[in-house]
Amino acid sequence: MAAAAPAAAASPEAPAVSGSADPETGDEDSREVRVLQSLRGRIYEAKNLLPYLGPNKMRDCFCTINLDQEEVYRTQVVEKSLSPYFSEEFYFEIPRTFQYLSFYVYDKNVLQRDLRIGKVAIKKEDLCSHSGKETWFSLQPIDSNSEVQGKVHLELRLNELITENGTVCQQLVVHIKACHGLPLINGQSCDPYATVSLVGPSRNDQKKTKVKKKTSNPQFNEVFYFEVTRSSSYSRKSQFQVEEEDIEKLEIRIDLWNNENLVQDVFLGEIKVPVNVLRSDSFHQAWYLLQPRDNGNKSSKTDDLGSLLLTLCYTEDCVLPSEYYGPLKTLLLKSPDVQPVSASAAYILGEICQDQKDAVLPLVRLLLHHNKLVPFITAVAELDLKDTPDANAIFRGNSLATQCLTEMMKIVGGHYLKVTLKPVLDEICESSKSCEIDPVKLKEGDNVENNKENLYYYVDKVFNTIVGSSVSCPTVMCDIFYSLRQMAAKKFPNHPHVQYSAVSSFVFLRFFAVAILSPHAFHLRPHYPDTQTVRTLTLISKTIQIIGNWGCQSRKKSRFKKSVMCEFLKMFQEERYFTDVKKFLDEISSTETKESSGTSEPVHLKEGEMYKRAQGRTRIGKKNFKKRWFCLTSRELTYHRQQGKDAIYTIPVKNILAVEKLEEGSFNKKNMFQVIHTEKTLYIQANNCVEANEWIDVLCRVSRCNHNRLSSFHPSAYLNGNWLCCQETSESTPGCKPCTAGIPADIQIDIDEDRETERIYSIFTLSLLKLQKMEETCGSIAVYQGPQKEPGYSKFTIEDSVATFKTIQQIKSTIEKLDEPHEKYRKKRSSSAKYGSKENPIVGKIS
C-alpha cells in the first residue's frame, strides 16, 4: 500500500516494521511487514531573495534538504544571484521516522558561518498533497520557534498524603521520562535539559532536570513533586478530590532548553498539560509533541524572503511477506508469452496507469529480475512497429516499449556510463575552457576560433570514447538491440539504414546524449553544472546526437537552422565518423556474448567523505575521529587522506565479515556504522542517516557472499577493556546480537521484487476505475462485434477483446485477494498507534 501516487523508483531496503498476517494461519505477528519510505523530486530555483544592503546586493546561494534538522542533501553554490537556478534532482531512501521535510536556503559565507535566508517546512502527513506537482513555496523565517521538533514522554500521578494531625494534602508527581527527536544545534546533537513548572493564577513553581550531554534523545527519568492544594483546605473526607476551581486553572508546563554555558540557552520547545487530566483518573501517561511558544513571533512579511520551486514525490510502501505476492507476480511474469501482448497484465498496467512512467520502473525491475524483460520489450516493440508507417519515425514516440527500454538502460547501464563517459565528463566539468561558438552569446574577451577548437576537441574525445566502448555494453542491452535491429529490417526491407536507426534512437538519443547533457542525473557528477558548463555539455550532446543519427542515414545533413552549428558540424562529415558509428552499432547489436557491464574490471560502487575512528588507539578526544575519503569497488574498500590521493588503508571485500550499525552511545555520535573484517573493526561516522544507510546497504551487498560472514555482532564498541553492549571483557567474545538479515547479492542491480510487486499492486489499486472502463470496453466489443465509438475507447489498445477481458478478470481477482492482508495490517497499525503513544503523540493541550 502506498501513501502517495506511485513513485518511479525503488532502491535498497529500509528498516522493517513488524506485524503482518501469515497467509496460512492469519497470525498477524508471525510475519514481518516492511515499511519503506522514499523521496524523489527536484529543486528547481529560488526567486526574489532578499538582497544585501549596500552596493553588492547579490548572494552566493545553496539549498539543503533536511529530515527534521538533519541535513541529507546539499546543492551546488550558485554565485551572485538573487534568483538562483539549481535544477537538481534527488532521490533517497528514508531510513527513519521524521516529522518535517525541510528545505533551507543559505547564503554562502567564506569567513563566517553560512547565513540561513529562509526555509520551507512540510509536515510528513502533508507530503502526499504535493506529490508530483511543481509548487512554489514561500520561504519562512527561521528562529527558535520555527525549529521546534521532538516529543516528550510524561507521567503524572496524584497522591494523597495524610499529615500527623489527620489532615489531607494532595501531591502532584511529575515524572519526565525521556525526549525523542530534539533538534540539532548548529548541526550537532544538543545538550538538553528540561524545566518543569506548575503554573496557576497565583503560583509558578519551577524545577529543573540535569543536563544531558550530546544527545537528541535524552533519557531524563527524573521525578518532581508539587503540592496541589494547601493541607488546611482539606479534611480526611476529601479523599482524592481536588476543588474544581483549582484544577481547572492549574497546568504543568515543560520547557526544553539547550545548555549553552557561556551564552543564552536556546529554546527547544514546550508542552502544557492541564492538571484536570487527573480528574477522572489519578494517573496519566503519554507522549506529547513539543510546541513553539504561544507568543512566538511570526513575521507578517514572510513573502519578502523569496520563494522556492520544488517537485516532490514521497512514497511509503508497506511490503508484505513474499508469499502474498506470488499470484500477482506469476500473472505479470507470464506477460511476454501472452498472445497478443496487449492482452497481458504488464501491458494493461501501462494502459490504465495515470502516468505510464509510474508503472514502467517497477515493471522493468521485476521483469529484469526474472530474465523476462528482453522478450517483453521485444513483444511490445513489435506492436509499436505495426503502427509505424514511416521508416524515419521508427521508435520516436513515447510508448510503453520506448519507456521500458529507456528505463532498462538507466538501470543496467550505470557502470557502463561510468567507465565510458565519467573521465571525459570530469575533464569537461573541471575545466574552465569556453566552447561557445555563437557570436551572439560570446562573453567579452572570448575568441570564436579558440572556442571552436575546444568544442571540437571535446566532441571528438567523447565520440571516440563511445564508439570504442562496445565491449563494455551490458549483455541485456545488446540482446534487446539485436531484437530491435532484426524487427526493423523485417518491417522495412527496402530501407537498409532503418536497422541502424532502431538502435541509434536509443543508445545515442536516449542514453549517451542524455547522460552528457545531465551527468548529475546519472551519478556521473555530484551536482548540476554551472551555466558555462551546461552550455558546453548542451553543444556536445547535440553534436553527438547528430553524428549518431548521420551514421544511420544514406544522406547526411544537419537539421540545425543556425548557420553557426551547420558550419561546426561540417568538421565531422568525414567518412570515418559514419563508419565508426555503424561499426559501433553493429558491435552492440550482435549476438556475440559481451562482458556483463564490464565486470572483468573492478566496479566502482560508491565514494564520499566520512569520519573514521583511529584504529588501535586508546586516547580520548576529537582527534580520534579523522575525516577521510572512502572509495568502494567490487574488490576493495579503501580510505584516503583526500580525494585523488593514494590509499592509506585497504580492506579487500573478501575479508569483510559483517557491516552493521553502531549504537550512538558508543562514542556519543550519530550515524555510525562498523565494518567488521579479519584484522580489526573499522568504525565510521557518516554525515547523515541517509548516507549511513546507503553505505551499509552497498557494503552488505558486495560482501554478502563471503564465506566467513558472521552470524552475530556487538552493537556497541569495545572500549576500556569491555564491550559496552554486553559488558564482556574479552575482545574475542562472539557477538551478542544476530547480524542483520542478508540483502540481495547482485551488486550491479539490487532489486527487491516484493517491493516492486507492491508498487504494481498500488498502481492497480489506484487505477481500478480505469481498469473497470477497459473491462466494459472489452465487453462492448465482444457483444457488438465491431469498433467502438464511445468516448474513451481510443485510449485503450485492445487487439483481442476476449483475451484482454480474461486477463482483467484475473487482475481484479488477484488484487482483491491482496486487499485483505493490507486491510488487516492497516487496522492493526491504526489501533496500535493510539493517541498519546510514541507513534501518535498528543498535539497541544488535552482536557
UniProtKB/Swiss-Prot annotation:
Residues the record lists as Phosphoserine modifications: S554
GO terms (molecular function) for this protein are:
GTPase activator activity; phospholipid binding; zinc ion binding
PH domain mapped to chain residues:
603-704
Q: Where is the C2 domain?
A: 19-137, 148-288
Q: Where does Zn(2+) bind?
A: H714, C725, C726, C736
List modified residues, type N-acetylalanine: A2
**Bilayer-crossing regions:** none
Q: Which InterPro entries does this UniProt record tie to the protein?
A: C2_dom (IPR000008), C2_domain_sf (IPR035892), PH-like_dom_sf (IPR011993), PH_domain (IPR001849), Ras_GTPase (IPR039360), RASA2_PH (IPR037773), RasGAP_CS (IPR023152), RasGAP_dom (IPR001936)
Where is this gene product found? Answer: Cell membrane
The UniProt keywords, alphabetically, are: Acetylation, Cell membrane, GTPase activation, Membrane, Metal-binding, Phosphoprotein, Repeat, Zinc, Zinc-finger
- Pull one GO CC term from this UniProt entry: plasma membrane
Domain Ras-GAP residue range list? 371-588
The segments labelled Disordered in the record are: 1-31, 819-847
Q: Where along the sequence does the record put site: Arginine finger?
A: R396
Q: GO biological process annotations for this chain's record?
A: intracellular signal transduction; negative regulation of Ras protein signal transduction
**SUPFAM superfamilies reported in the protein's UniProt record:** C2 domain (Calcium/lipid-binding domain, CaLB) (SSF49562), GTPase activation domain, GAP (SSF48350), PH domain-like (SSF50729)
- Zinc fingers classed as Btk-type: ranges: 706-742
Q: Where is the composition biased (Low complexity)?
A: 1-21
> Which purpose does this protein serve, as stated in its record?
Inhibitory regulator of the Ras-cyclic AMP pathway. Binds inositol tetrakisphosphate (IP4) and phospholipids.
Spell out the protein name for this chain.
Ras GTPase-activating protein 2
Q: Which gene encodes it?
A: Rasa2
